[in-house]
Design a protein with these regions (language model features):
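Activity-critical C-terminal alpha-helical subdomain
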Residues: 172, 430-464
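FAD-binding subdomain of flavoenzyme oxidoreductases
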Residues: 93-247, 458
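Short, ordered loop/turn segments at secondary-structure junctions
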Residues: 66-68, 91, 131, 253, ...
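Generic secondary-structure signature for well-ordered alpha-helical cores
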Residues: 3-14, 57-60, 117-124, 147, ...
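C-terminal substrate-recognition/cap domain of FAD-linked oxidoreductases
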Residues: 16-23, 221-224, 231-398, 404-407, ...
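N-terminal flexible segment immediately upstream of the FAD-binding catalytic core
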Residues: 1-53, 70-102, 255-267, 318-340, ...
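N-terminal accessory segments
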Residues: 1-28, 58-60, 301-317, 414-419, ...
Length: 464
């Protein structure tokens, strides 16, 4: 099998040495680890299709992988030593960038940061943004329907996509690549593959939407009394800023404390602490003065008791420093010790009640555990993370993983929410899907999987 794969992609693109493949075989949290037969890196859609055709004929299972930044184990092989990791890192070309149509067609291995730079090269803006953007890839972003910090204004990855090129399990290449904003010719196959996590086909390229480059961007860090006050502030800023509101991130005091403790070169923007914080970003497309707008809104918010205090970044460096206080929360938690994490969403108006009830349940069941709920309040996506008690044994704390998951996921369901807001299902949440998904929807999903991947070679053991 290895010889036939080498004949397709070249021997240098087939990696078998364990010291090389190990970096592909472990996901970022260390929850899942596998042993692949090999890692293969095709450099074109044609090579990738030939690989899939060969694997399909020989019933060899394939695990597609982009930047290996996924957080639910969707990109990780099992321990059989028989699965192939199909890395898309060499499919990294920009096929077309069109500032007139406001589109760009990129291959799946382009990193998100590179995609943003391609947009900037023609004075356009690609709004998908997240902490892993230097490593995560467009293919992975689309396979998981990634969210990030600007969903409030632009939607998730699905809403930024006009068309796809997808390698199917039997080696055929499906293309819906198009710069058209209107096309009613049949079923929308593009959206079928977005969020399918490589179980229905392997995304090899995508046509993505571009937007006008914002004239200016302003960042504020706001001190708050509670999530309820944060909700009032969100509604107030929405009404005043309209579509200029790009991000509204909720941060508890413990999260800020952990960042200040564990991340070098960070500092508290306020002279005294607050129980909660919000990071706000506005970026009008028109040549309005965003600083004046944000100053006016926050001044009025403080007067009307929607906020306690606020600071607006006075430079690009300070804006970056404020964003770092949000983006390094997960890393700070990791350095603090054990952390049990949840990527959930609930209706925005119910976020304060959810945080309150979740906190009560955690304290009743694990009295010394420390909830750290933070995230994209503007779109209802919370990362409800729980850090270990001070001085606790990490292994003993993490042994409560399943119990804590049951508590948070049940409450999420009670609130009409989702157990996976933006990270996907992968291996981590596969067993939960039958508990939360409509039975008819599950039946349709299984039928689609059987039709598109009859031999079950595409990312088995993931999602469905």
């Amino acid at each position: 099998m290895l010889e036939r794969l080498s004949a397709i992609v070249g021997s240098s693109a087939v990696k078998t040495a364990s010291d090389i493949t190990v970096s592909y075989s472990t996901e970022p949290r260390g929850l899942f680890f596998g042993v692949p037969l090999c890692v293969i890196e095709p450099k074109s859609s044609g090579e990738l299709c030939a690989v899939l055709a060969l694997c399909s004929k020989n019933s060899v299972e394939v695990v597609p992988q982009g930047g290996n930044t996924g957080l639910v184990g969707g990109q990780t092989p099992n321990n059989s030593g028989q699965q192939i990791i199909l890395s898309l890192r060499r499919l990294n070309q920009a096929r077309e960038i069109d500032p007139i149509s406001n589109t760009m067609t990129l291959e799946a291995g382009v990193t998100l940061h590179e995609a943003q730079q391609f947009a900037l090269s023609v004075e356009r803006y690609f709004p998908l943004s997240m902490a892993s953007e230097g490593s995560c890839t467009i293919g992975g972003n689309l396979a998981t329907n990634a969210g990030g910090v600007h969903v409030l204004a632009y939607g998730p990855a699905r809403d930024l996509t006009l068309g796809l090129e997808v390698a199917l399990a039997d080696g055929r290449l499906l293309t819906t690549l198009s710069k058209l904003r209107k096309d009613n010719t049949g079923y929308d196959l593009t959206r079928l593959f977005i969020g399918s996590e490589g179980t229905l086909g392997v995304i090899t390229a995508a046509t993505l939407k571009l937007f006008p480059q914002p004239h200016a961007r302003e960042i504020a860090f706001v001190g708050l009394e509670s999530p309820t006050q944060a909700l009032h502030l969100l509604n107030f800023v929405k009404a005043g800023a309209g579509s200029a509101l790009q991000a509204f991130e909720l941060i508890p005091s413990l999260a800020l404390k952990l960042v200040l403790t564990h991340i070098p070169n960070t500092r508290d923007p306020f002279s005294k602490p607050h129980p909660w914080y919000a990071l706000i970003e506005i970026a009008p497309n028109a040549k309005n003065d965003p600083y004046a707008l944000l100053t006016q809104l926050l001044s009025a918010a403080i007067t009307q008791k929607f906020a306690r205090d606020a600071i607006i970044a006075s430079s690009l460096d300070q804006a970056r420093a404020l964003w770092n206080l949000r983006e390094y929360i997960s890393e700070a938690q990791k350095r603090e010790g054990g952390s049990i994490k949840h990527d959930i969403s609930v209706p925005i108006d119910r976020i304060p009640d959810f945080i309150d009830q979740a906190g009560q349940l955690i304290q009743e069941n694990f009295p010394q555990a420390r909830p750290v709920p933070f995230g994209h309040m503007g779109d209802g996506n919370l990362h409800y993370n729980i850090s270990q008690p001070i001085g606790a044994d990490k292994a003993q704390f993490l042994a409560h993983w399943e119990h804590m998951n049951e508590i948070i996921h049940k409450l999420t369901q009670d609130f009409g929410g989702s157990i996976s807001a933006e990270h996907g299902i992968g291996q981590l949440k596969r067993h939960l899907l039958t508990q939360v998904k409509d039975p008819v929807a599950l039946d349709i999903m299984r039928n689609l999987k059987t039709m598109l991947d009859p031999f079950g070679i595409l990312n088995p053991g993931k999602v469905i």
